Amino acid sequence: MAQPAVAWFEVTGKDGPKLQKFYSDLFNWQVQDAGDGSGYGLVQAAPKGIGGGIGPAQDGGPGAVTFYVEVDNPADYLAKAEKLGGKTIVPPTEIPNFGLTFAFFADPEGHVVGLSKGAVQ
């Protein structure tokens, strides 16, 4: 099995459009609407780097900065994280229209990390 790599980043918060403008102005990132009505914006990967997303927090909370590690089986990695002292936050969740499955776990100190399988752009 290949070593899993960081494949995606996400910045969410109370004001998704304001965050999109901030990061667009700061880094000259082109943020494209995801097209699903969520207010989420997609950032294409630069020649050196990874793509990501910026938008509103789903629960209306303060948001977070998260990175996602691309893996072949999110459920297996959640189980492994739990054996190592982590905790599952969100079980594997499929987003069919994006061909993506994601999950979240917290490490032993509470840092939340995303897992992804599929079409991370």
Language model region names:
Residues 2-7, 11, 32, 78-79, ...:
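Vicinal oxygen chelate
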Residues 23:
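Catalytic core of tubulin tyrosine ligase-like
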Residues 61-87:
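Mid-chain, well-packed structural core segment of small domains
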Residues 29-63, 112-117:
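Conserved short beta-strand elements that form part of the metal-binding/catalytic scaffold
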Residues 42, 68, 102-104:
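Conserved hydrophobic/aromatic beta-strand scaffold that supports enzyme active sites
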Residues 1-20, 47-49, 64-67, 116-121:
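N-terminal beta-strand motif that seeds the catalytic metal site of vicinal oxygen chelate
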